[in-house]
Swiss-Prot record:
It is a single-pass membrane protein. Pathway: Secondary metabolite biosynthesis. GO terms for molecular function: oxidoreductase activity. Its main location: membrane. A motif (HXXHC 1) lies at residues 185-189. The 2 HXXHC motifs are conserved in ustYa family proteins and might form active sites. Disruption phenotype: Abolishes the production of asperipin-2a. The chain crosses the membrane at residues 55-75. A motif (HXXHC 2) lies at residues 223-227. Glycans are attached at residues 112, 214. This is UstYa family oxidase aprY.
Length: 334
């Protein structure tokens, strides 16, 4: 408060009333006093400017301090929100039980983007046949996992319509719901497209799950169309930003793309291992009866306007918030 008191003391001193004795004061004395008052006014103006400047500096410093505290609180809350396992993945992922269960490693690698297969190839480059189909088959048994009602809400789904593990059959209690890893469904779809693409490969007869000898069957084409669509949506949703370089090669007048780009990847093997170690018995799942009190949706092939209660093309929910639209043609299994 010292600058304020000093300012007001100066103000009172410079503006104190000084009566003039007109009878005795000479012109020179009056002129001197007038100049003295002018100097006092100039000094007061300077001190007023300094005072205002100090006020603005003080306000600026105060605002900067408040801004710093606010930013610090926001950063701290953000760090706390994504603290724990998979802190780097959570901001770009919808909640999943596996994010809480294990730390999913990430690593840097160079993808094998060569046009011609290398000697040691992945199952995607193997010659189509029974052995190759068997390698793909390990991904076709999509395992099922247990989550709670609260977890279903975090997924943005309605627990009243999601399949539960019947306690009489499974013995998991009343708060046990069924989920499966979406990435495994994507690999299944890729395998479906692989079989369709190579169905006329010399000597190849597709085997394994979801193999239909009648390639013109309507449901098969619907299945393939679904797989193309779901893979495209996933590619677009997870659109990577890496770039491809180009090169000149002998005997070609057009650029040759180098698809072997450097990538940062999630460890799929860690996810696959978790799926195997934390799933219910697959055989028992296949033999599972429909519980008497199960929620049963109308058959999608009989109601083309909606599927599982959602208008087609209207899947735009927010995490943890259930849709407001009512379920259509809902019923309980009797």
């Amino acid at each position: 408060m010292e600058p304020f008191s000093k300012f007001f003391k100066s103000f009172r001193r410079y503006h104190r009333f000084h009566p003039l004795d007109s009878s005795s004061a000479s012109d020179d004395e009056l002129a001197g006093k007038y100049e003295e008052h002018l100097l006092m006014d100039e000094r007061l103006k300077r001190e007023t400017v300094i005072f205002k400047s100090r006020i603005w500096i003080l306000l600026t410093i105060t605002n900067l301090i408040i801004l710093g505290i606010t930013v610090s609180m926001i950063v701290t809350s953000h760090c706390q929100l994504y603290a724990g396992k998979n802190a780097d993945l959570r901001p770009i992922s919808w909640w999943s039980p596996i994010l809480d269960a294990i730390e999913i490693p990430t690593y840097e690698t160079t993808l094998n983007g060569t046009f011609f297969a290398k000697p040691e190839v992945s199952i995607a480059r193997e010659e189509p046949g029974p052995e190759n189909d068997a390698d793909w088959e390990q991904y076709e048994t999509i395992r099922t996992h247990i989550v709670s009602r609260e977890d279903i809400l975090r997924l943005g789904k309605d627990p009243d319509t999601v399949m539960r593990f019947d306690n009489d059959y499974w013995g998991f209690g009343d708060d046990a719901y069924m989920v499966q890893l979406d990435v495994m469904h994507q690999i299944h779809c890729l395998n479906m497209l692989r079989k369709a693409a190579f169905h006329d490969y010399p000597g190849y007869v597709p085997t394994g799950a979801h193999t239909d000898a009648n390639n013109t069957h309507a449901s098969r084409w619907t299945h393939l169309g679904h797989c193309v669509d779901i893979l495209l949506q996933n590619i677009q949703c997870n659109a990577n930003t890496e770039v491809i370089t180009l090169a000149w090669v002998e005997g070609r007048t057009q650029p040759w793309p180098d698809f072997s780009v450097n990538r940062k990847c999630r460890d799929f093997e860690a996810i696959y291992k978790w799926q195997l170690e934390n799933s219910v018995d697959a055989g028992k799942f296949d033999r599972m009866p429909i519980p008497h009190d199960a929620y049963v949706w109308p058959a999608p092939w009989e109601n083309r306007e909606s599927e599982l209660g959602e208008k087609l093309g209207k899947h735009q929910k927010q995490e943890g918030v259930l849709g407001q639209a009512g379920h259509q043609h809902t019923k309980r299994h009797e």
